[in-house]
């Protein structure tokens, strides 16, 4: 039986999100599971580590929902230097000799409150955004001048963690809870500019993506154990683990049959909103309730659904 559910990978440094998906596919083949549909719920740059939700089977139908979810990151900024990529990988384009007397711990903490809530943010030139059909990072690497439009994103929370001095540069680690579409590299740049200096990201770790936290994440070594004979169940979370942030709608056998056939259910005594409908413990579909009527948003083809 083909697996359906989530593997939450603690993505290591240097591994791309597409490579991580490839690693899961390889492990499934090695485990004798055959060809498994696999997708990820939110790109994480190779220079970033942490939570990368990887969907298997029917859970891939929820990848789009995961992309729209908010994220939590911990990141370190080096103040006094800005690079073209806004991280360690790039070429230095702006620099000051020292930030002593310009930036200190208090300045970092003081500026955070100004960035809470909806803000306008310009994405990095080195990003996956498409410009006239081409990725911005491809154009930037080719030497083209890339100008991206600003966008409105939301910073739900921004907290100071720690800071230290090294060779005349201040390093500060912050934790940010952000909406979809937020670039942490741009946030670090803009925070530095607000302090009157420059900055680039030296460490980026995703602690949470949607309902999934770092405490649920497994290492690449743990994943590889599945390819060597360990049970997939050791690392696979159920499909409904990606739905814990919305309420469940319990269905009887006839209701489950109707939903699986794409029909609407009327006369339900529930408030309007998004629900995941289930028959027993088995997810049947995502449904939208309005005026007591449930309409299928996305159906799941899972075994043991009441017929």
Placement of each model-derived feature along the sequence:
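Accessory RNA 3′-end/elbow-binding domains used by RNA modification enzymes
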Residues: 1-47, 69, 171, 194-307
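Residue-level signal for inorganic ion chemistry
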Residues: 54, 75, 133, 187, ...
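Extended alpha-helical targeting/anchoring segments
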Residues: 126-127, 131-156
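Pseudouridine synthase
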Residues: 128, 135, 170-211
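Helix-hairpin-helix/helix-loop-helix acidic hairpins
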Residues: 152-172
